[in-house]
């Protein structure tokens, strides 16, 4: 589990970068 990776994924999926 990589929190940073998850955060980036959420960022891209929700388009809130």
Swiss-Prot record:
Tissue: Expressed by the skin glands.
Disulfide bonds: 11-17
Keywords, sorted A to Z: Amphibian defense peptide, Antibiotic, Antimicrobial, Disulfide bond, Secreted
Cell compartment(s), UniProt: Secreted
Lineage: Eukaryota, Metazoa, Chordata, Craniata, Vertebrata
Function: Antimicrobial peptide.
Top-level taxonomic group: Eukaryota
Entry's Gene Ontology cellular component terms: extracellular region
Family under the similarity heading: Belongs to the frog skin active peptide (FSAP) family. Brevinin subfamily.
Keyword field contains Disulfide bond: yes
The protein's name in its UniProt record: Brevinin-1AVb
One example of a Gene Ontology biological process annotation: defense response to bacterium
